[in-house]
């Protein structure tokens, strides 16, 4: 099973900006590692939440398309809301 997500580069940083994203059905994330600089991104919450229900999401290499460029990543960390079935933030590491 392969996973491919479309992402936008995230320009607004901070707690307020993150809360606005989550309120609009999006989830903030970051891609880091490798020889490139870290990139803050925005993903669609429902697509990622549905994908993370599969065990393969945590073990396989994922593809994230950011500004027309494909990044090969693995999930490094996921932060979840303590009481709601919501994702709060994701960390991806380049492969």
Swiss-Prot record:
Alphabetically ordered keywords of this record: Ribonucleoprotein, Ribosomal protein, RNA-binding, rRNA-binding
Keyword Ribonucleoprotein part of the UniProt annotation: yes
Signal peptide: none
Gene Ontology CC: cytosolic large ribosomal subunit
SUPFAM superfamilies registered for this protein in UniProt: Ribosomal protein L25-like
GO MF annotation: an example: 5S rRNA binding
Gene3D superfamilies linked: Ribosomal Protein L25, Chain P
Superkingdom field: Bacteria
Keyword Nucleotide-binding in annotation: no
Any one biological process term the GO annotation gives: translation
The protein's assembly and partners: Part of the 50S ribosomal subunit; part of the 5S rRNA/L5/L18/L25 subcomplex. Contacts the 5S rRNA. Binds to the 5S rRNA independently of L5 and L18.
Family to which the UniProt record says this protein belongs: Belongs to the bacterial ribosomal protein bL25 family.
Primary role: This is one of the proteins that binds to the 5S RNA in the ribosome where it forms part of the central protuberance.
NCBIfam families tied to this protein: PRK05943.1
Protein name: Large ribosomal subunit protein bL25
Annotated gene: rplY
